[in-house]
Amino acid sequence: MKAQGETEDSERLSKMSSLLERLHAKFNQNRPWSETIKLVRQVMEKRVVMSSGGHQHLVSCLETLQKALKVTSLPAMTDRLESIARQNGLGSHLSASGTECYITSDMFYVEVQLDPAGQLCDVKVAHHGENPVSCPELVQQLREKNFEEFSKHLKGLVNLYNLPGDNKLKTKMYLALQSLEQDLSKMAIMYWKATNAAPLDKILHGSVGYLTPRSGGHLMNMKYYASPSDLLDDKTASPIILHEKNVPRSLGMNASVTIEGTSAMYKLPIAPLIMGSHPADNKWTPSFSAVTSANSVDLPACFFLKFPQPIPVSKAFVQKLQNCTGIPLFETPPTYLPLYELITQFELSKDPDPLPLNHNMRFYAALPGQQHCYFLNKDAPLPDGQSLQGTLVSKITFQHPGRVPLILNMIRHQVAYNTLIGSCVKRTILKEDSPGLLQFEVCPLSESRFSVSFQHPVNDSLVCVVMDVQDSTHVSCKLYKGLSDALICTDDFIAKVVQRCMSIPVTMRAIRRKAETIQADTPALSLIAETVEDMVKKNLPPASSPGYGMTTGNNPMSGTTTPTNTFPGGPITTLFNMSMSIKDRHESVGHGEDFSKVSQNPILTSLLQITGNGGSTIGSSPTPPHHTPPPVSSMAGNTKNHPMLMNLLKDNPAQDFSTLYGSSPLERQNSSSGSPRMEMCSGSNKAKKKKSSRVPPDKPKHQTEDDFQRELFSMDVDSQNPMFDVSMTADALDTPHITPAPSQCSTPPATYPQPVSHPQPSIQRMVRLSSSDSIGPDVTDILSDIAEEASKLPSTSDDCPPIGTPVRDSSSSGHSQSALFDSDVFQTNNNENPYTDPADLIADAAGSPNSDSPTNHFFPDGVDFNPDLLNSQSQSGFGEEYFDESSQSGDNDDFKGFASQALNTLGMPMLGGDNGEPKFKGSSQADTVDFSIISVAGKALGAADLMEHHSGSQSPLLTTGELGKEKTQKRVKEGNGTGASSGSGPGSDSKPGKRSRTPSNDGKSKDKPPKRKKADTEGKSPSHSSSNRPFTPPTSTGGSKSPGSSGRSQTPPGVATPPIPKITIQIPKGTVMVGKPSSHSQYTSSGSVSSSGSKSHHSHSSSSSSLASASTSGKVKSSKSEGSSSSKLSGSMYASQGSSGSSQSKNSSQTGGKPGSSPITKHGLSSGSSSTKMKPQGKPSSLMNPSISKPNISPSHSRPPGGSDKLASPMKPVPGTPPSSKAKSPISSGSSGSHVSGTSSSSGMKSSSGSASSGSVSQKTPPASNSCTPSSSSFSSSGSSMSSSQNQHGSSKGKSPSRNKKPSLTAVIDKLKHGVVTSGPGGEDPIDSQMGASTNSSNHPMSSKHNTSGGEFQSKREKSDKDKSKVSASGGSVDSSKKTSESKNVGSTGVAKIIISKHDGGSPSIKAKVTLQKPGESGGDGLRPQIASSKNYGSPLISGSTPKHERGSPSHSKSPAYTPQNVDSESESGSSIAERSYQNSPSSEDGIRPLPEYSTEKHKKHKKEKKKVRDKDRDKKKSHSMKPENWSKSPISSDPTASVTNNPILSADRPSRLSPDFMIGEEDDDLMDVALIGN
């Protein structure tokens, strides 16, 4: 065993030894050690290779550790530098000494010099082929251990050479960049040497901005724009002081200059091109050497201006840039989105931590004492029908250094626009129902223009500020407000604020505060007002005829441009055009000193109307109906016959408010108070332009200062009286608005009831004020003194130019009329609408073909005197501007109180007034002719809007009953047809009254001078004007507004004015078609169509809707479908305020009170329907519901001047309201009545057919309910071009009612013929258009042609045209007649006689007979219904189917029988009254809704009161007086009076204005008697 075990062990050992031997043998070979090390390294490297993710993770961890380590030693610094180099893909190595670290690439290297302790010594950068150059910026970064910034520089250097090609090509590209940088640096030095500009000047104006040379990895930087907010420290809110050594790189907007590879080849200079060191011209343009092959090279690269963040630019900007550089901006076509959406994203992305914000384009701004909500209407259509599109631009290509200054200027322009829009974009979140939250709508008008619409700070109306970014440092601003709106501030003030802050919220806050300060300053003017009032009482000028504004009635439409659109110049022969032109609100009107004087002096206006327009107006006795007398005799001609006129012309110039406050943009503003679009609408009405140029919306502005002062004073005196509230509202705006604003604002609801008690004294006072002409030098002196004092007064804002102008604007828009309308308005109270006669006044205006226009000129204020506006204006806008300039408006504070009242009632109470009654009576006959008022009322606007519209075209709305009618007549006498004006806007007394007033004056001045006198004696005319204010009680507003409006601006009733022939339009009862308007509908369309219907409409609680109804009643049936569409459209867009259709839709209430179903809608009164819709919108704020109480909105007010379109625009942006339709309103409003489709058609119609046709077209297009409204106003053009513009305006704004001027008598006749009346109030604009048809006051059936847009009635209209083809007194009126297309609903035909009686009572002569087509439904007055169908509610004749009571008929206006209270009087004018009633009745829902400030309850109460009064009046007046609810039902109310009474406001104020049926009834006879007997 042992041996065996040993053997095994030995074997093992041997085996092991053999293995060891083999191992030893193997590894004993000669293998070098280096080989072994290499093998180990390879093994180690293979192990290190891990997944790429893991590797990156480790690297990031190492870098994080590196950053966390403090660099305090040389090794730590070199390690960090090497780490940074690796991060940027660069190589790095250390010098032998270890104190230099080199970071390298193929094209450059960076040398970092350190000391042994690791401290930095220097940093040098060496580009390819160059010596290293020290870079101070990199030295600073590394010394501060700011390694992140150092890394950015390295990245920039890498990107600089991120070019195609080899190193040689890259070197050439670098040389090209260097040469460009040298040239740009020379340009910067040249600019600095030439201007010694500070850093901020370089940024904003420098040819290459503030230039920072390329340094390290930072490219050459051009700082080209910095907004004021950029210059505030974000943390401390303290201003950043810029100096050469302290201009933060991140400040403002920057662009870097670089070169990048491109797919195309470009010849780029590789050597500097600038020769010498001095500029070649005074624009700092250097002289460049030519680009040749010697100094340039073709490279696959180009120069670029690159932006840190892509900039939103408009489509137009892209095209301009490409035209400038000659190089496509994008290699592939970009995707275009709404520009405002891009701007919103751009602004929100500035937040360092941008979180998604669900804004829906609604943003909130919390400012000291105010909270704003801004709705950016990104989809609003531009004039071309497209929304404002844009795209993002991140870089701009260019080849030559000389292109850089041009590019920078273009970018600055775009960025300035973006800055303003972006100022609304905040991340602030507020609750929708936050108390006091103010709504604003920002809507694009073009690539450089936009509008901001908001509620008037004082009045319940829509105001629009149009901002035009002319360049990066100049922003022109224009405030569009209702003529009767209180003063807000001047355009210059707004422009200064905008340019100082470049922020919309800050500007809106400043505007509001400015309005408040102006309002606060009003009381200081009370003493002056009293003095002026006394003077007026002692020196009452003769009542002036409505011809004043008409002087340019036939003026061809000179091309007018509105912020939004440009209307092609074209002859708009009728007043209508003038109305539109009025809008000259452009202010472009500058026919001469005389004209401005005219526009400034209501008295002067009335005088001119009487002398010059008497013939030209439809019913003017001198001119045969078929003649379209020269637009009104030239001013010179008119002045020859009137010494007083001569005096006014002499005195006014120097003391003209325009002159006194001429510098103040307010005047210009007010003159262009119409919506931006309205301006476009305003056509060639030179007279209007003249008048409106200064203060289209505020005639009084144009009035002599005396007039302005008187009205202001009277307003002041009356301010204590409730009636004054309403009255003042309208007047204050017209006049300098010294007293009106306060009184208006001061007396709230109480004013409505009170008006009746105080009306007479107040009104008389007011009347005298309006007839400040008689005051002459005394008043002028006083005014001038006031103006001087005002200018001396410390302005609330330094920015504000002389406030006098604004004040004046205010007054012009409301003051004059305010005085005229105030008393009446108050007298009228609920039932007595001083406006009742306003319808008559308007009728008178209609009587003269040109009268409408002049009246419009004169009464644009009146028309614009929506009670709301006046009240609110006096409170804020009116008072503010005026006070800023001077403390003339002592009563502004008073008005403040009244404003809410008036707004609530919408001037209903104002309509009724004891004095107002008689005055209206006087004008009540004229009312018959002034059916256009109804048309105006037809406007979708609420009472205020209606009032405005009405008073412009007709005062039917105003009529609250017989009493109201009588008032209107008297008013008319006093106020040259102001009565008609006042009649127009019971609901929105102030505004509509103003509007009405302009048209009314035109038509009425001629016809109504005698009545005026009568009214003056009553002392109501001036106050009548006031009644138009939106705030005035509905009843009061209706009556007082129209008469006051016309009377105030023209001449006081007391003054002995050359007799003005009365024009009565007799319409067979059978002709009138009765509609069944719902009694409560805003404006019953049916009432408008038929006398009976009109009246019933009037009886509607809401006079404004009544009015619309009246005018549309006849029309309704034929155009039900149209109306409904229109209605809908209107509703969506503030239509109610801005569209006659809106009212009409209510009038259409015949069809159930639904806008869509309303008969008016059918005819194009659909606008009226929209008005109805508007009402609901009104809830958010008056802004939202301009048509209801917004009629007073500044843009709307300007409607009388022709800015109705503009108004529409402002109206459209109601933040609270759905933006869809409205949002578009501002853009399209001006050019066409309807915001969208309607607009274009409306404009086209207007231009083609005179004003008349446009309205019709509008109405025809349901989608264009807004357009309908504008169109209508143009239809009013027969004698009231203004109507058309109003209509457009109203459509867009809902204030268009005020826009409708009084149509000429011809227009009324035309309406009667065609039964177009139906559209009257309801589709204020549509009616206007029909009125336009009617407006061929000359009795031309031709007006139907103009109304062609209503296709249905066109043929009929044309027939009428044949009958009346010769009646072109209105100029455009004949064309208006053409609108018969809408008449086709009228089944039977009647003959309407136009009776023109002389003021002295001479036997009346029948100037023309018109065949009336009666809608199947119309009972007696075919004319009326047909006109309604044509929706010429704007025209007095059409409005009132009853011939006698046509607005144009002075006798009717004068007729004492027609008391404002008397519904019967109103019923005489029948449909006219109905229309007027609709317009007048602030009580109308439409009117009420727009007045958020004024409780709807008050409005309703007012309406009820008005209804009660009207009912009483009707009962008294006629056995067949219908109850407010009943009258609308009867096709032809047994008694026109009854129908009128139905609408308390309307009936009282506009009895004569009722539908033809009613007129044909006893009313007709009465009116005829009055016309025959004389005033």
Swiss-Prot record:
Positions of region (Interaction with the Mediator complex): 108-212, 215-390
Basic residues bias locations: 1498-1507
Region spans: Interaction with PPARGC1A and THRA: 622-701
Region (Disordered): 609-706, 737-760, 791-818, 874-895, 951-1564
A single cellular component GO annotation: nucleolus
Cited InterPro entries: Mediator_complex_subunit_1 (IPR051999), Mediator_Med1 (IPR019680)
Effect after changing residue 960 to S: In strain: ISS and 129/Ola
Organism: Mus musculus (Mouse)
Domain of life: Eukaryota
Protein name in UniProt: Mediator of RNA polymerase II transcription subunit 1
Subcellular location: Nucleus
Basic and acidic residues compositional bias, start-end: 696-706, 963-974, 1354-1366
Region (Interaction with THRA): 405-644
